[in-house]
Swiss-Prot record:
Belongs to the DEFL family. This is Putative defensin-like protein 271. Pfam families: AtDEF-like. InterPro entries: DEFL. The keyword Signal applies. It comes from the Eukaryota. Its main location: secreted. One of its GO terms (cellular component) is extracellular region. Disulfide bonds join C33-C72, C39-C61, C45-C70, C49-C71. Residues 1-23 form the signal peptide. GO terms for biological process: defense response to fungus; killing of cells of another organism. The keyword Coiled coil does not apply. It comes from Arabidopsis thaliana. Keywords: Antimicrobial, Disulfide bond, Fungicide, Plant defense, Secreted, Signal.
Amino acid sequence: MTSMKLHIVALCIIVSFLVNVQSTRIMDASSDCEFKGPCHKKEDCYDSCGVNKPPFNNAICVPGRDSFQCCCILS
C-alpha cells in the first residue's frame, strides 16, 4: 500500500514538472508569437495585436506562467 502511494506521488511530481517545461516553451522568445499583455479571451487581444488592420495579424489568448497572455501570431 505504501509503495502504491509512493508511485502515485512520484507520478504526480513528474507530470507537474512536464507541465512546467511545456509552459516555459510556450513563452519562448523564438516562437511565432509576439506576447503583448494579459487577456481573458482572444477578443481582448484584438486591439493590442492590430487584428483587422494591416498586416492583419491573428491573435489568440494563451496560458502563460502566471496568467493568460495575448499571442500576436507573426505572419
